[in-house]
């Protein structure tokens, strides 16, 4: 069975798609291009209106592709998590809708679809971080946590992905070490909010220091920092750790107190 994975949305979805690819390859499936695929897995975003519209349009496009090429079609990701029942009713042509946190279940789900079963399966928020990635590209997106506790008025992430969950530091460091040994030159730390990471008192800054001390010729990039928790300790770490890029991804609305207040 040849499988093509098409990913929409943010870098965190890219990480999830890599996890799906890894578990399927270990189960004996082949990851291929769209032209060679017998099955398409569409990993969607469901965060804001344009992302939802893109996801719906992609579902429609792959339904047309399914009709012309006879492939199986699985839709997963945030849109499937958020609107599971509605999507299942609206798009009967789709062979499976799968919520988030089900990465390790994909071999079973794929086999059920192959047997002709239509699978409608909600996500498991307790299992968002329990998966492995084999590939070590030059730029490696390393997820350190999932979910969020901020609950801003405008944001659907806690609704979709639940409260903050963090990975054990030793697991993060081991994954980084494997990636670096495999040729990765840029480790990109991703989370809903990197500054919210805390594992039994071990903070984002502690993690940066330990990552910086790993052997190898690489650098570290930070994405998705909430400015409320960017303190002097964080600034000092970013400034002084040689492998950490002097860069932070912070939404522009955070420069305006009035906008922040209205956002919650």
PLM feature spans:
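Conserved SAM/AdoMet-binding glycine-rich loop
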Residues: 73-77, 82, 87, 181-264
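Proteins enriched for Cys/Gly/acidic motifs involved in redox and nucleic-acid/cofactor modification
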Residues: 1-195, 233, 248
